[in-house]
Amino acid sequence: MGVGEFSRNLALPLHDIRLQTQVESLHEGYVRTSVGKISGDVIIVATDPITSAQLIGATKAPRMNRSTTWYHSLPEGEITAQRLRIDMKSSGPIINSIAISNLSPYYAPAGKTLVSTTTLENASESEVRRHLAHMWKVSTQSWDLVSKYEIKQSLPLHEVSQPLESSVKVRDNLFLIGDHRGTPSQQGAMNSGRRAAEQIN
């Protein structure tokens, strides 16, 4: 169980999925793709904010944040918390950290705990370890770095003056969904989809 359940469940009722097909333009009642025209009563654009802006002809796309996710393995039981940790004092490069295998044991082998940590700025592993030790109140010297993933355009930047939610309806029968229509998170993306579905029904 984990984030993969989102995509697996979303795909269950779908019978016509086109792979390796690029959407080239949007029109009233249809989209033009690399393999021809696909018609529909409603068009929902659900892609990254830059591609979305290009498809709907927006003059400005949201600015994007880069992020790095760090995965550390440690002995099971060293951390038992199941909640996301946030350093409100910003005393290091980490914005949040969570022992994800405490929520779903499928993320780590028996006897181990997997900690997932996110940084926005460039940081060395030693800086991350020091900040993790501060946040979790444990020594991190024996933690093993499993992997790290750098994503150049991971989340849209939510400006201070920006409303919490933006409209998902672009015009009649055209909707735009994604975390750029709300809070930059999986929750924001899912929420925008729900708002669009409610307006369509």
What are these regions (language model features)?
Residues Q22, D48-P49, I151, D179:
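Flexible loop residues that form catalytic
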Residues M1-L12, R18, E121-A123:
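Short beta-strand to alpha-helix junction loop
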Residues R18-T21, H27, G178:
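Short loop/edge segments at beta-strand edges and connector loops
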Residues L14, G40-D41, R171:
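Short, well-ordered alpha-helix to beta-strand connector turns
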Residues V23-L26, S166-V168:
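Short, exposed beta-strand/loop patches in secreted or surface proteins that constitute
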Residues E24-W136:
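Mid-domain catalytic core of redox enzymes
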Residues I100, P105-N201:
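Conserved flavin/dinucleotide-binding core of flavoenzymes
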